[in-house]
Regions:
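Hydrophobic/aromatic residues located in beta-strands of well-ordered beta-sheets
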Residues: 7, 48-50, 94, 125, ...
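Short phosphate-binding loop-to-helix
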Residues: 49, 55-114
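N-terminal glycine-rich phosphate-binding loop and ensuing alpha1 helix
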Residues: 3-51
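Conserved core of the sugar-phosphate nucleotidyltransferase
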Residues: 104-197
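Conserved alpha/beta core of the MobA/IspD/sugar-nucleotide pyrophosphorylase nucleotidyltransferase superfamily
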Residues: 170-249
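Residues that recognize and position ribonucleotide moieties
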Residues: 16, 24, 102, 181, ...
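Short, high-confidence coil segments that cap the C-terminus of an alpha-helix
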Residues: 45, 91, 119-122, 215
């Protein structure tokens, strides 16, 4: 029997810099619809749903024909929300695609899924893209990841890693972590039950919880990235400009 793949888009109404973010309109559609339609294009996914505790988001998703699962309002993070959906599902693999990525490339999500399909012992996977801009590499809002020779995560940080002691590198400054995750269902439920760890709290990066507890995270290197991630009104304006010009980049 093959794997059953569930893709979940966690969406919450509250946002410090952009309240109601999932419902912000880009080119006439709510952002959550852009994400949903792109995830529907991912090869190998059997089911796509939006997980939310907000009735306004739920109504919008139902209006465009998407599946919505109402979840608790008590979750600490998006992964906990995804885990609640997984708990009531018969899926064997679960993808978590953030709801602020209206330009996410289906191929990027497929690369994460491919790691889990290729290695049945791998509990968790994610993705990275090269950083060629020093300013982005130094930006604490851009999460970096370093991996071993097998492509598995050694560490994630908001700090600029690795440190180039001898000067500028000949290639990329580092790799940006993309907020797309794949889990084996049983590990996702275990992960959500683990207590937060010191490094997770220090960096405010929940994936460090897995590393600190000794679990492997496979990291797919991709070139497409996820395009513009929407966190501010300025990001929304840029997204509109991209769609007006020549479609998603």
């Amino acid at each position: 029997m093959g794997e059953r793949v569930l893709a979940v888009i966690p969406a919450r109404f509250g946002s410090t810099r952009l309240p109601g973010k999932p419902l912000a309109r880009i080119a006439g559609k709510p952002m959550v619809q852009h994400v949903y339609e792109r995830v529907r294009q991912v090869q190998g996914v059997d089911r796509v749903c939006v997980a939310t505790d907000d009735d306004r988001i739920a109504r919008v998703v139902e209006a465009f024909g998407g599946e919505v699962v109402k979840t608790s309002s008590e979750h600490r993070c998006g992964t906990d929300r995804v885990a609640e959906v997984a708990r009531g599902s018969d899926a064997t693999l679960v993808l978590n695609v953030q709801g602020d990525m209206p330009f996410v490339e289906p191929a990027t999500v497929e690369a994460v899924l491919a790691l889990l399909l290729a290695d049945p012992s791998l509990p968790m996977a994610t993705a990275k893209v090269p950083i060629f801009d020093r300013i982005a590499w130094e930006n604490p809002h851009v999460v970096k990841v370093v991996t071993d020779r097998r492509g598995q995560a050694l560490y994630f940080s908001r700090s600029p890693i690795p440190f180039w002691r001898a000067g500028e590198p000949s290639g990329p400054w580092g790799f940006k972590h993309l907020g797309i995750y794949g889990f084996r269902r049983e590990f996702l439920l275990e992960f959500a039950a683990l207590p937060p760890t010191d490094l997770e709290r220090a960096e405010s990066l929940e994936q460090l919880r897995a590393l600190e507890h000794g679990y492997r995270i496979g990291v797919a290197e991709v070139q497409e990235g996820v395009g513009i991630e929407i966190d501010t009104p300025e990001d929304l304006e840029r997204a509109e400009e991209v769609l007006r010009a020549d479609g998603p980049q």
